[in-house]
A protein has these predicted regions:
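Walker A/P-loop
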Residues: 31-52
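Conserved pre-motif I regulatory segment
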Residues: 2-38
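Post-DEXD/H (motif II) to motif III coupling segment of the RecA-like Helicase ATP-binding lobe
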Residues: 129-185
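Conserved segment of the helicase C-terminal RecA-like domain
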Residues: 327-357
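Conserved interdomain linker/interface between the two RecA-like ATPase lobes of SF2 helicase motors
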Residues: 168-238
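Conserved helicase ATPase core of P-loop NTP-dependent helicases/translocases
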Residues: 89-99, 245-246, 256-294
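A short beta-strand element within the Helicase C-terminal
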Residues: 119-120, 289-314, 320-327, 337-342
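Conserved Walker A/P-loop ATP-binding site and its immediately adjacent core
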Residues: 46-48, 57-80, 241
């Protein structure tokens, strides 16, 4: 089993941190046929997969890279060609359908329908999005190697299908080493989620959109952005397509070039997300400043000069929160930080996204409680009532503005006011 993953020379020079991750992954998959690689935003998980694929090709092995979205199929295919990997694409009626080639980039939906192919290694990109079709492919190929890739493999029950977790470098270490941008978070003191029900561990979408998609709050969100992030390239996460469109109109009304993007932007009678892909490319090329989406941009979105992430919605999901913040953390020359505007009170509810620990995959039984115990900080951050900076629990004097509040009970504030969140002070 182990000879498939020997440390052969590669043509592309990896960064030292990528070499470390690749070596750790090799060590794990030598003894586990079903492994999940947990690697943070911007670490080049696709590039690491490419190195494994190049080694496998030398041993005449067939490889399949599986994506759950069409734009990720196109993005991965482009990366493979840039690295000299000739491949086919199995996705709808894609023009690059060359099934005889030993490497294929596939959409999980199409592959499941045409699962007559024989591969030695499967890569599941963004494995936190784990469909029944993924399970079907696993079941139909018991002798193959499977490598899941994710920055946030927190999906309940994932450990029932994968036996090992490879987690070489925590996100906090990546920020300390300046591999990722540092971040500050501004968040609201209160938000009214009264009556918003919880379904499958997160807020019910219809209820959430009704609570959040209000003209006053929409205006507050744009006002706050103008005050704190006017010159920053920005991603906004909304509660629904209608909410996205209202936010877009509000930004445009203020003279800010903004566009909303959603999963329905397909050219008529085709599977290709031409409309959505064009919007992403225009955003990448600075044709407009603010892009707005529900969940379409939480995974596989690699525009590195984003320096502001706005949560115009709320969530109880650590995975969604970490994914969203991660969209703004990729390293980019000339940018040192990312500003997070948390209008949903997420940070005060869950904690800072670089403080969650993850020690094993959730098998739906014991792992769930163990990970949650490790993930959630004992004390949660609070907002400075003076400057909006979110500070850690236990920190009284604000490191941003120097304000030290008196000990008083809850203070009412308007739902649009943001407060900078601060981290917990270390005991001497």
């Amino acid at each position: 089993m182990s000879n498939l993953f020997e440390n052969n020379p590669t043509e592309v020079e990896l960064y030292p941190i990528q070499e470390h991750i690749l070596n750790e992954l090799r060590n794990t998959i030598r003894y586990n046929k079903r492994t999940v690689l947990m690697a943070g935003t911007g670490l080049g998980k696709t590039q690491i997969a490419i190195q494994i694929i190049k080694q496998a090709l030398k041993k005449e092995k067939r490889c399949c890279f599986v994506c759950h979205r069409i734009n990720l199929v196109e993005q991965t295919s482009r990366a493979f060609y840039l690295q000299g990997i000739h491949h086919g694409v199995i996705q709808g009626n894609h023009p690059d359908y060359f099934p005889h080639r030993p490497v294929q980039v596939c959409s999980v939906q199409t592959l499941a329908k045409r699962d007559q192919y024989d591969f030695d290694i499967y890569f599941f990109d963004e494995i936190q999005v784990f469909f029944k079709t993924h399970k079907q492919i696993l079941k139909n190929n018991p002798d193959a190697f499977f490598i899941g890739l994710s920055a946030t493999p927190f999906t309940p029950g994932l450990g029932q299908y994968f036996t090992a977790l490879c987690h070489p470098v925590p996100i906090k270490e990546l920020i300390q080493k300046k591999i990722l941008k540092r971040f500050d978070i501004y968040g609201p003191n209160t938000i009214d989620l009264t009556g918003v029900r919880t379904v499958a561990g997160d807020y019910k979408k219809d209820d959430l959109e009704k609570a959040v998609d209000k003209p006053k709050l929409t205006a507050d969100i744009v006002d706050t952005w103008l005050r704190l992030a006017r010159d920053r390239k920005t991603i906004v996460f909304s509660s629904g397509v209608g909410h996205s469109r209202h936010l877009e109109k509000e930004f445009l009304k203020r003279g800010i070039k903004a566009k909303e993007i959603n999963g329905y932007m397909r050219k008529e009678n085709t599977e290709y997300d031409i409309g959505a892909n064009q919007i992403i490319e225009d955003f990448r090329n600075n044709e407009f400043q603010v892009i707005i989406s529900v969940e379409m941009l939480v995974a596989g979105f690699d525009v590195t000069d984003v320096s502001c992430v706005v949560f115009a919605t709320s969530t109880k999901s650590i995975m969604k929160f970490c994914q969203g913040v991660g969209r703004g953390l990729r390293k980019h020359e000339g940018l040192e930080d990312c500003l997070v505007l948390d209008h949903g009170g997420i940070t005060e509810r869950l904690g800072f996204p670089d403080e969650f620990e993850f020690i094993q995959l959730d098998d739906g039984k014991h792992a769930e409680s163990k990970n949650k115990q490790q993930e959630k900080p004992e004390q949660l951050p609070k907002a400075c009532p003076s400057c909006d900076f979110i500070k850690p629990a236990g920190v009284q004097k604000c490191p941003a503005c120097g304000f030290k509040p008196e000990f008083v009970k809850d203070v009412e504030v308007s739902e649009g006011e943001l407060k900078k969140l601060q981290r917990k002070a270390k005991k001497e």
